[in-house]
A protein has these predicted regions:
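Acidic (Asp/Glu)-rich catalytic clusters
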Residues: 21-28, 45-63, 80-96, 133-138, ...
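Acidic/histidine-rich catalytic cores of soluble enzymes
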Residues: 136-220
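Active-site acidic/histidine proton-transfer and metal-coordination neighborhood
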Residues: 79-174
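Gly/Pro-rich active-site loop or hairpin
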Residues: 44, 75-76, 115-125, 185-249, ...
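Conserved, mostly hydrophobic/aromatic
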Residues: 32, 98, 143, 178, ...
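C-terminal accessory extensions appended to soluble enzyme cores
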Residues: 267-365
Length: 365
């Protein structure tokens, strides 16, 4: 098996482009990941179009969606239009695969939404599989899902690997293993990163994401809450586990470093970002790659039904939960709410408050 390619999640901001220019000039960026739907409503700058086309023509472009919302309980015109635009995008450029986030964004202003987790349940699994069928049918490419950083409870953390494994089974899909997302869960629920990583089907990992984040003070306990804000350096704890993770992921093809485009402004920040890139490069070069059973991603026939799978009761709960969080309802009030799908009685009060802060920041209504 070849060593995985090292690349970046491309950002259009001038600060980001200035920071990565030395890497582009030295041909160090072996693959680009592009969140294609952030420009669905705008025209790409000419320089960006040319850069993406260059990587596309060399089979080194991968796509990462943000706004599909895999687990919305109702199928909407917005999702239908999203898939139509994605079809146009994959006709325009050659992508090696397309990925999306785990979770749902049940808001009126989806462009300012944030994905929230869903519990493992036969109905949520059925909805997720239906949305993945439609995604793969639209692009006729391998399709993958990224693990989510945010969790309301340790139960969410423990079941996500199993959920994702079941979710991708019918389409021969793959996983993005985001190690900073796992780092957030490890910090917030006081477990070891390795213990969470072991819960994932590592043979299904085709791509790894690396990034940094930030801390916020806990209101309910004497600890700090880790947030996946993509605005800082890769934590040392992630560097510590990365060699082992690379060795365990027998079908790994890509390692992508993520950083928000407006967060690398000073020369010191640029140098530190480049140092992170160089350090990851060294780890990949020094890693011991094991050859596993080669998987042909996305080769199964999809079980696409004529009508999208929907569930009115789940939709009501998603809408009610989002509004409770947006309205800053008390944690105890939310924990006492009667839900069928969401087990709010098990939720951590700090995580409820964190979700409220995120949703208020993005103002989905």
């Amino acid at each position: 098996m070849k060593k995985p390619l090292l690349g970046l999640s491309m950002m259009p901001e001038a600060d980001f482009v200035s920071a990565i220019l030395p890497l582009l000039q030295s041909n160090s960026v072996e693959v680009l990941e592009w969140s294609f739907d952030i420009f669905y409503e705008a025209k790409e700058p000419e320089w960006l179009d040319e850069l993406l086309n260059f990587y596309s023509e060399n089979q080194r472009l991968i796509g990462h969606g943000v706004y599909y919302s895999l687990f919305d309980a109702l199928w909407t015109e917005r999702q239908e239009n999203w898939l139509k635009k994605l079809k146009e995008e994959v006709r325009k450029r050659k992508y090696s695969h397309i990925t999306e986030h785990f979770g749902f964004m049940n808001t009126e202003n989806f462009h300012q939404g944030v994905p929230l987790p869903v519990p493992l349940h036969p109905k949520t699994l059925l909805i997720g599989k239906d949305r993945l069928y439609r995604l793969q049918d639209a692009v006729e490419l391998p399709v993958g899902i990224e693990n989510l950083a945010f969790s309301f409870s340790i139960e969410d953390v423990k079941e996500q690997g199993v959920f994702l494994d079941n979710l991708i089974a019918d389409i021969n899909g793959f996983l993005i293993l985001d190690l900073h997302n796992i780092y957030c869960q490890a910090c917030n629920f006081e477990v070891e990163m390795e213990d969470i990583i072991r819960l994932y089907p590592l043979d299904k990992v085709r791509e790894i994401h690396l990034s940094g984040g930030s801390w916020q003070e806990s209101v309910y306990a004497r600890k700090m809450i880790r947030r996946d804000t993509h605005d800082n350096l890769i934590p040392e704890e992630i560097f510590s586990v990365l060699p082992s993770v690379i060795t365990q992921c027998n079908n790994l093809e890509y390692v992508i470093i993520e950083r928000l485009g407006h967060t690398i402004k000073t020369d010191q920040e640029k140098r530190a970002f480049l140092d992170d890139f160089t350090r990851v490069r060294r780890i990949i070069d020094d890693s011991e790659i094991k050859t596993g059973k080669k998987i042909r991603w996305g080769q199964k026939e999809t079980g696409l039904s004529n009508s999208p799978v929907e569930d009115d009761a789940l939709h009501e709960e998603q809408s009610r939960l989002t509004k409770l969080l947006f309205n800053s309802s008390g944690a105890e009030m939310i924990k006492e709410q009667r839900f069928h799908y969401f087990k709010t009685e098990n939720w951590d009060p700090d995580m409820i408050l964190t979700a409220q802060n995120i949703i208020k920041k993005w103002n989905p209504y």
